[in-house]
Amino acid sequence: RLLLLCQSHAGYLLLSRLLSRAYRENQYHGRAEIKEAWLHANASGTEGLIALSGARYGEIGLAILQNNLPHAETLTQKWADLFPDRFYIELQRDGHTNEAMLVQQSLVLARKFNLPVVATQSVQFLNAGDYRAHEARACIAEGYVLDDKRRPRNFTEQQYFKTQEEMATLFADLP
């Protein structure tokens, strides 16, 4: 998983073409997904697009969480090459397991490859008080009840839309 942002009108047009193709050719459970090969095959490259690493859900984050740091380095170089001066290592602090280790290793990669970092939030619900309602919705979608001790816990209470001040406080230890 990688987050693409439009940097310019050219980037908007490119992303529109990629998403249109994904809707026509590559849907997974009704969700359009852009294939990495399409980014490599595009004549104008990725000009006009900014890429964020995807934090724990991106290839780099997954490699770090699997303790495969050499692979994480290879992936970091690949994405940095594909998005020159437009690839950011994404950092999140939302209460998931191994979060501190993931942030630390992500910072190591950012320093090693001279990449900027960006603090983001994996927002799943609007307000902090909406967590329980969100969990109920997730249980309904997955066929569980809230009291089921075996149900997956994929979300945390911290995944609400934080204010700028909350994000600044959360990442105050980083530049």
Predicted features along the sequence, with ranges:
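Phosphodiester-processing cores and adjacent nucleic acid-binding clamps
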Residues: 1-175
